[in-house]
Amino acid sequence: MSLDMNVAVDVRRIQLALDELGTVTRDRAIPRVMAAALLSSTEQAFERQADPDTGKGWEAWSDSWLAWRQDHGFVPGSILTLHGDLARSITTDYGQDYALIGSPKIYAAIHQWGGTPDMAPRPAGVPARPYMGLDKTGEQEIFDAIRKRVSAALRQ
């Protein structure tokens, strides 16, 4: 005696869930959250005067820069803030597959990554004081948004 057994499984709900998961990577909601988190982390870096990625405080002013600031009435003050132009210049952008943060200020890069005494057009021995980045709070906001979006997609 033989027994043939067939099981039919309706996979439409599974296919719909997979299709909905695919939309998670194609919408702009997550990159928008990422851009906002980058901006918030950067704003906090200026407040804390610390690298947003590591939390390490920025190097203090050089003696010559401190003297210049004192002579011109800019002490006390924040390390990367003279008039606030750099902090105000921060912009973000995002799209389906990216989130960006930056500044159009010509001096933005040297403050982020530092400079060397032999750099052209003149000596630029400036220590790196990273201000753009992603702190732990921003990272958590992004992960929470991803979890929420994926969870919503799977409930479909």
Curated annotation (Swiss-Prot):
Q: What is this protein called?
A: Putative capsid assembly protein G
Q: Which compartment or compartments is the protein found in?
A: Virion; Host cytoplasm
Family annotation (InterPro entries):
Phage_virion_morphogenesis
Organism of origin is Escherichia phage Mu (Bacteriophage Mu)
- Keywords carried by this UniProt record: Host cytoplasm, Late protein, Viral capsid assembly, Viral release from host cell, Virion
**What domain of life is recorded for the organism?**
Viruses
Can the keyword Glycoprotein be found in this entry's annotation? no
Induction per the UniProt record: Expressed in the late phase of the viral replicative cycle. Expression of late genes is activated by the viral late transcription activator C.
GO cellular-component terms in the record? host cell cytoplasm; virion component
Its function, per the record, reads: Involved in capsid assembly.
